[in-house]
Every structure is written in structure tokens, then in C-alpha cells.
Amino acid sequence: MAKRILFREEARKALEQGINQLADAIKVTIGPKGRNVVLEKKFGAPQIVNDGVTIAKEIELADPLENTGAQLMREVASKTNDVAGDGTTTATILAQSMVREGLKNISAGANPVALRRGIEKTTAYLVEQIAAHAKPVEGRKTIAEVATISAGNDSEVGEMIAKAMDAVGRDGVITVEESKSLETELDVVEGMQFDRGYISPYFVTDSERMVAEYENAYLLITSNKISSLQDLVPILERVAREGRPLLVIAEDVEGEALATLVVNRLRGVLNAVAVKAPAFGDRRKAMLEDIAILTGGQLISEDVGIKLDKVTLDMMGVARKITVTKDKTTIVTDGSTKAAVEKRVAQIRKQLETTDSEYDREKLQERIAKLAGGVAVIKVGAATETELKDRKLRIEDALNATRAAVEEGIVPGGGATLLHLSKGIPAFKAKLNAEEQVGAEIVYRALQAPLFQIAHNAGLEGSVVVEKVLEKEMPFGFDALTGTYVDMFAQGIVDPAKVVRSALQNAASIAGMYLTTEAIVVEKPEPKPAAGSAPKGMM
């Protein structure tokens, strides 16, 4: 395939057009008065969303040059979403502003490499400042406030997430499911989560969220490595006859065995997903036994004289629901094994009392928390399928934001933190050389963009709102819902520090890469062959 190569100004301009198209579609969603975006679906009803990363994933531009720019911007959103679970729209707005300002300076003759260094140094300074201004999350009220803001000012969601954290603890497992009713409700069930994901991405059932989800599944729990097809076939046949999904937890699944599971899953013969067993050595065996007890199954191991090909259905565990992502597996059970779980927890507590090792103590406490903590399930209800999907996305965002807040603390929300921190840039800039100072200036201007857009979406003049907030000190900001200038902490308008930090770092990273781009190589569209003339009819 022939390639098309563009250089310097022309290359950057083409990328910028793609960046702007994607950013303009996303930035209308920011703030309490942000608008929705409708996504056309090839099959089924269109999806109405208010979530930056979901919109970014849907956008594919016809022009390959512009599409390359859009993909760069998509990277900002998805990277921020992966790290912090929220703040994707803020990251996109910051990146677009840095790119626009940077391009102006490069056109005027600035050195792109020095600009990038200036942007990186200023961002590192701001990250330190964000950490310095962050307040630790204390009490249920703050958790509810963080969740409410992230869910688009839905206080019912905020209250529910605070309740869920009360039920299972701050480090507990909280999952979001679709409800059959109109109501959104909270349920605390028996279950466990461990840090291992699917072995192959071909196991996913939802390619948008990259997760494998099944209900009423069998679990094959083994400490062996599975590579031979002969070992696996009898089990697969038994499970397939039942018409239920299968989760395989093993030391490893490879070769013919893995290929068979993937092929059966893709052909729809048997819904299966394989994950590696958590932990290592003796601790791995103990955790597999915990999972077996929780799900009412048996640990299949040659140590206890059970071979894989002799496994029957009553030796397998059962889960009400399983959710597997690329790095986590969540198992939710129906509570029928409660007595056995309590017995197991008591046994681990006895071990805890007799151990002298600090490391062993920590790991035993971790096992108790996993077994006894349970899983809080938020069941999302709505009147229509479209509303249900939007509400579920908002709740997942709010949950991620709340976890991020617990981790690194909170800062004033609504774009106020970034704006107030920009006041320190002129003094910091003095430490940089003349060329790097231009990079610092680019970041300075970009920090005004999120609040400008929040005000703009609320139907106000962004630059006026920015000026008024700059006149006041941290933690004052603009409440776009009421149109007033308030103390953001007192009003409960807060953002997790981790979300603000990740948004800024990812925006600066992509902007720096873009500004130092000197050439772009894309595929050249092949000319379509001219249509042949129609055959002449018979006389």
C-alpha cells in the first residue's frame, strides 16, 4: 500500500483538525449543565451519553490524517480513564488547549523541543502543588459529595455509593449491575475479588468495556497447569450439556487447552473464560481453597488425588455472577455457603493469632477481608434501555472517582484548583530558560480552559467567570448549577486529586508529543476503478 507523507506545519495542521473534532464533541459534556451526545449504534437504539471516554471510543474519522489526530486525543481520554476512572473530559480540554497554544508559538518560530521541556517541567511543579493542596477524605459526607459531583449532580447516586462503602469498607468490592426494576438499589452479597484478569482478550463478552460477564456460572478451581486437551474435554462436555458458562481458575491455561476454550467461546458452543490463580506458592493454594469454599466447590489438585479428567459437576463451584476484566476477577455468590465461609474465616483467625511474621499476618488479614467482606452490588434501574446505559456509566464514573478520592484526597472542584494553581506559574517560570518559559505560558493558558468550558456550557461568558474566580483565593470557585461564586469545599463541590493530576499529566504528555511531531505517514487512498459501461441489450 502506497503511503502519503506530510511534513512540519502541514502535518501538525492535519493532526490538529482531528484533535479539534474529537475534543469539540467531548467538551460539551463537562459541568453540571453539560449537554449529552447521541451515539449511533449499528444494531439497536442509539446511545445517549455524558461520558468523555465513551464518546472518544466511538469516533472514527474518514480522513486518515485527521483520524490520526483524533486517535492521539482518544489516548488522553482512555489513559486518564484507566488510571483514575474519571476526568476524561477535563484531560481532553486541557490537551486541546495546549495543542492550540503550542501550535501558535511554533508557527511564530518557537523551538518545539524547548516548548515540550517547559510543558513537562511546569506540569511536574503543578503535580506537587495538587498533592500539597489535597485534603484527605474524612467521613461519609465527603464520600457522598465526591460521588454526587462525578455522577452529574445526582445526590441519590452519591448517597448510595457512600452506603456501599459503609457496608464493605473503603477497600471493599463494589460492583454495578443492571436491575430488572425501575429503582436503583443496593444489595450486599457474599463474594470475592482477586487481582488476576482473563488470559486472552478473546474471552470478553463486552468489547466496549473489555469485560467478560456471566451469570449462574460453574467454576473449575485447580492448582494445576492446564495445557492438554484430553484433560479438559470431559469437563467441557459436561458443562456444555448444562448450557451454563464456565470460569476456569488454574495455575495457567495454555496450548491446546486455551485454544479450545477460545474457539468454543467464539463459536458460541460454550461460554467460558480462563484466569490465572492469584498469589504464589502455598498462599496460592490457600486462596484457591478460599474460593472453592466460597463457591461450594472443591480444589482440584493431584496432591489430593483428583485428576482433571475425573472432575464431576458437583466438584465445581457455582457463582451467581462473575465479572472478569484485564486485571481483576469478581465472583458474586448466592450466600448458600455462608456457614462454610464463617468456619473458614474462624480457621484463618486462629492462624493469625499464632503467626509471628508481620508479612504472614498482613496476608492472612487480606484473606479474611476478601472472604468476610462480601460484595456490595449497586443495581441500576431506569425507565428505558437508553437511560439505563447512561445511568450505569455515570455510576461507574462516580465509583471510580470516589475510590480515587480515598486514595489521594480531594481538591476544590469545577476547574477551580487548576485555575488557582496557575497563579504560581509566573514565579515558577523565572527558574526556566527563555524558550522553556513559552512552554510554561502554554500550560498557564490551558489551566483556564476547563472552567471556561464549564461556564460556557452553563450559558455564561467563560472569560468573565475565569476573571472573577482569579480575583479570589483557593478554595473559592464557580458553582455552575446555581451560577454563584462559593467556597467549593463548603458547598461540597470537590474533585479527587488523583483525577485532576492524571488529567493534567496525560494532557501534557500528548501535547508534548504532538508539538514535537515533524512528519506524519498515513496510507494513501487507492483510486477507485472507473465503473464499466453497461452491457448492450439484445436487438
UniProtKB/Swiss-Prot annotation:
- Please give the catalytic activity noted in the UniProt record: ATP + H2O + a folded polypeptide = ADP + phosphate + an unfolded polypeptide
Q: Which family does it belong to?
A: Belongs to the chaperonin (HSP60) family.
Recorded protein name is Chaperonin GroEL 2
| Residue positions binding ATP | 29-32, 86-90, 414, 479-481, 495
From which organism does this entry originate?
Answer: Synechococcus sp. (strain JA-2-3B'a(2-13))
EC?
5.6.1.7
What is the purpose of this protein?
A: Together with its co-chaperonin GroES, plays an essential role in assisting protein folding. The GroEL-GroES system forms a nano-cage that allows encapsulation of the non-native substrate proteins and provides a physical environment optimized to promote and accelerate protein folding.
- Partners and quaternary state? Forms a cylinder of 14 subunits composed of two heptameric rings stacked back-to-back. Interacts with the co-chaperonin GroES.
**Compartments (UniProt record):** Cytoplasm
